[in-house]
Amino acid sequence: MKKFFVIVGIMALVFAFSGCTAFETDTEALLSPPVFTEEQEKLNSALTEVIGEDYVLKYPENGNTNSAFIFEDLDGDGTEEAMAFYSVLDESTRINVLKNENGEWISVYTAPGFYGNIQKVDFVKIDEKGPVVVIKWEQEIGIYRYENEKLESVYRETCEGFEVADIDGNGFYEVAVFIGSPMRRTIVNMIYGENGKINVSEQISIHAQYDSIYSKISGLLFEDKHAYFIDSEISDGVYLTEIITFENGKAKREFVADFVDTGDSKNEDSSGEIIVLGGNYGERGIFLRNTKIGCLDTNADGIMEMPAEVRKDYAREASESIFFIQYVQHNGTEAVPVWNGIANTENGYLFEVPEKWNKTVEIEKSAASNSFVFCEKKNGNKIFEIFAVSKNDYQDKYEDYILAAEDETKNYYVKSYVAEGNEYYISPEKYTGSFIFI
């Protein structure tokens, strides 16, 4: 059995405590007081008048809001309120809402929170009213709405995390809450607004664990059909795409891959087929692969495509091979290929090649030269080569190559080993348009 690729993501968290930094630490109360801006000093004074001086400000650990004082028009009246997060005597974190009257900040409401740190704060336009406040605590999510100078809790749940997207395309956002499960499945609750009320959809389950999701995007599944596309790593070096739709208050996991041979027998030859199913999953519609790529709109037609591998063995088997990739698009009745090529995930690009190469060409990876080489299967002759070169490296040694594309850090060179007229020849005019950076 071949070995799976092992891709390990490493996240570094930096903790600090100041008026312009984002994180809280366990030693926060022992450090010097933060340096406030003039406006923050006014807020701090207003807060002190209400709760005294024995409190510790709390800071969201990530997201766009990286201050203990956050400004937002909470009730939609055109004027910003301020929110402050704090704890007193190591109690749970509390939320204080302040409003500005004639240039002075005054506290108008205090709401209970939870124990532990604040991981993320978001403001979501869920309906015609003002935004709801979505707070991810250490192990729970809280959703709040500010009306009549009161911050009321409208949803609370233990969860792994949440994502915000306009999944149904109605111009308002839904909050997808990901809840862990002992059955290696993840429960998803969809929080949405309707008729001025906050509602919770019926639960659906997906294979993706929240921490393993590396790509998520909302877009069209096909014309007039909106969806949410999730790509995750379900085990070492094994990746899949799952699709969620949301209509009329109901969430659904879509199955769109009925067109392929699922290959139930390991000994059955499926050379050239797209494999979407394997192992013990027992369901159709899962794009299972060994290449870490996500859903894209490859042809810029406004409809999302899903990645699948074209391979001679089954996707449920471990593999260190480099496979051709097809991006498939759903047309309302079936999924059909619209893009064919290869993926170089280390250097962050896709490169389009003719579909006929899938059965007659092999791909070799050269770690020494950081290149992909395409060779004829029948004789091993080189056809085409792609180099990814750091812009800090000397470029002179690539004089025999064509600079086909570049990004902020790398130049991408190509070389054809066959002449014009050969069945494998790609014209220089097509090189640049064949790259998609991921």
Question: PLM features: residue spans?
Answer:
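Surface-exposed amphipathic alpha-helical segments
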Residues: S416-I438
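Terminus-proximal functional modules
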Residues: K378-N379, F387-Y394, E408-N411, A419-G421, ...
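Generic cytosolic/nucleocytoplasmic N-terminal low-complexity/intrinsically disordered segments
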Residues: M1-K2, L98
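Small/flexible residues
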Residues: F4-F5, F255, Y417
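Secretory pathway targeting signatures of secreted, lumenal, and periplasmic proteins
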Residues: K356-L403
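Sec-dependent N-terminal signal peptides of Gram-positive bacterial secreted proteins and lipoproteins
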Residues: K2-E24
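Beta-propeller-forming repeat regions
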Residues: G19-K365, F372, L403-D407, Y412, ...
